[in-house]
Amino acid sequence: MKYEWRRQEKQLYGAKTTPVLVTVPTQSCIMINGEGNPNDTDFSNRVSALYSVAYAVKMAYIKTAKGEYDDFAVYPLEGVWQKIENCELIKEKLRYTLVIRQPDFVGEDGVCAALERTKHRKLNPLLEEVRFGTVPGETCVQLLHVGAYDDEPVSFAKMDEFVHAHSLTRTEEGHREIYLSNATRTEKNRLKTILRYRVK
């Protein structure tokens, strides 16, 4: 049976255009850090490096699967965004971590083995920057943003209003974006992105 995150984790990935409070469990991920404008080539190269590892993990798992699931859908790309300076948003001054979550049933050993094999097979220096990590569980507010990335402030304003109305406190300046659409194949006004940040 194939594990489908869209169907089996609707609480996390079935977000609506109105804000909700969610409990995000501890997650295993592959990730790579970056800095600068997400429209630049370096960003897309880092995305490609991460996906090459994600699909290597998937193919290796299919060959050796013995549990309940014999395949899985690769999780969507995520971006954790921070501003370098506490000032107006300047894309060239952004810091980010690109993330692709890994299924719990694959395990750290399986992910790391696939990562090492990919480093040896593909002559991409950025693969040396890809790493395995664990993201602790957290309480978050999230919302589905439909439209261009540059229009996200409107959705963040809705989230901030929700936080205030429910007597919550935002605990980080940065935020997480989960990209449900392929930006190279989708019109800007139809892009679907889950916006998420931690609260208490």
Outline where the language-model segments fall:
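A solvent-exposed interaction/effector surface
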Residues: 1-200
